[in-house]
């Protein structure tokens, strides 16, 4: 790779495509975790480039909590159909039977049962030995220290003190029976890189990333967009229309919007240049307990 002639975005693109191809060649049953967000959209775009003009040699897996934004579900189904991807959707049946609800049971229990346990169930059900994820090192401190090849034991647990060295572009993919890896092709990308690449490559994204007037409720310092009627208003709470957008997407009761007028990709990029906060500041699950994200990853989270 001629690093002198390549822009930094093309270098990142080449690195990610190399990682995706390595995993496809090295593992017998890989899968791409598809959470419908901007990083998943970029990762899917890179995977399609990696195997063009052929189709993806692995399926997409969406671990559904039942609480995503309606626009996310519509985008997911439309994207899978447009690109001819095999889409697997899994919900934790035990969580559904228990009626797990982020309002009633809290973000920690909701995430553990519907996301972490749901993911482990799906990986065991289909026997996947490698799972692509869209996490980036600039998002959060526990992700900053995680390798591109993130090894998980037979219980899908991550041990941050027992990670393999990654020298240059050499990755050690040897695993024992029952073990697996999570692979993060976007590890070295930043939020700014993601948005510039989306603009450069004209990648389709969920409209929630663009500012619009939306019904919003302010609760616990978070701007919560009301997506359906599964919420009980507390005394004094009022739903108002405000110009907001999302920097990150998840379950609608646990994902805060930000006030913004950025309605185009160039406006989002310009907004990011002066932003001083993390994109995940609006994710309740990142701060529902001390060391929240690392604890979740140790237990098998994405």
From Swiss-Prot:
Protein family per UniProt: Belongs to the PAPS reductase family. CysD subfamily.
Encoded by which gene? cysD
Its EC number is 2.7.7.4
- May I ask which residue range the UniProt record assigns to the signal sequence? none
Named in its record, the pathway it takes part in is: Sulfur metabolism; hydrogen sulfide biosynthesis; sulfite from sulfate: step 1/3
SUPFAM superfamilies membership: Adenine nucleotide alpha hydrolases-like
According to the UniProt entry, its GO molecular function terms are: ATP binding; sulfate adenylyltransferase (ATP) activity
Per UniProt, subunit arrangement is: Heterodimer composed of CysD, the smaller subunit, and CysN.
Q: Protein name, please?
A: Sulfate adenylyltransferase subunit 2
Question: Which species does this protein come from?
Answer: Escherichia coli O157:H7
Which domain of life does this protein belong to?
A: Bacteria
Extract the Gene3D superfamilies matched here: HUPs
Give the enzyme's main class according to its UniProt record, as a single word.
transferase
Q: Per UniProt, which keywords does this protein have?
A: ATP-binding, Nucleotide-binding, Nucleotidyltransferase, Transferase
């Amino acid at each position: 790779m001629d690093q002198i002639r390549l822009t930094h975005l093309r270098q990142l693109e080449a690195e990610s495509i190399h990682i995706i191809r390595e995993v496809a060649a090295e593992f017998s049953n890989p899968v791409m975790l598809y959470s419908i967000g901007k990083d998943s959209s970029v990762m899917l775009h890179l995977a399609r480039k990696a195997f063009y003009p052929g189709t993806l040699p692995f399926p997409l897996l969406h671990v559904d909590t039942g609480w995503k934004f309606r626009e996310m579900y519509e985008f997911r189904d439309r994207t899978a159909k447009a690109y001819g991807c095999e889409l697997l959707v899994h919900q934790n049946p035990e969580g559904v039977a228990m009626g797990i609800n982020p309002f009633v049971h809290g973000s920690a229990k909701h995430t553990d049962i519907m996301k972490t346990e749901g993911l482990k169930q799906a990986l065991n059900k289909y026997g996947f030995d490698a799972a692509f994820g869209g996490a980036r090192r600039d998002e959060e401190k526990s992700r900053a220290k995680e390798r591109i090849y993130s090894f998980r034991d037979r219980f899908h647990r991550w041990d941050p003190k027992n990670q393999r060295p990654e020298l240059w572009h050499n990755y050690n993919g040897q695993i024992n029976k029952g073990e697996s890896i999570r692979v993060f092709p976007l590890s070295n990308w930043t939020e700014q890189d993601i948005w510039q690449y989306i603009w450069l490559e004209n990648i389709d994204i969920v409209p929630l990333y663009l500012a619009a007037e939306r019904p919003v409720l302010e609760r616990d310092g978070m701007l919560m967009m009301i997506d359906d009627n599964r919420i009980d208003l507390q005394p004094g709470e009022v739903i108002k229309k405000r110009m907001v957008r999302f920097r990150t997407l998840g379950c609608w009761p646990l994902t805060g919007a930000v006030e913004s007028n950025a309605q185009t990709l160039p406006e989002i990029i310009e907004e990011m240049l002066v932003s001083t906060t993390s994109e995940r500041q609006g994710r309740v699950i990142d701060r529902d307990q001390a060391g929240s994200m690392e604890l979740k990853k140790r237990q098998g989270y994405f």
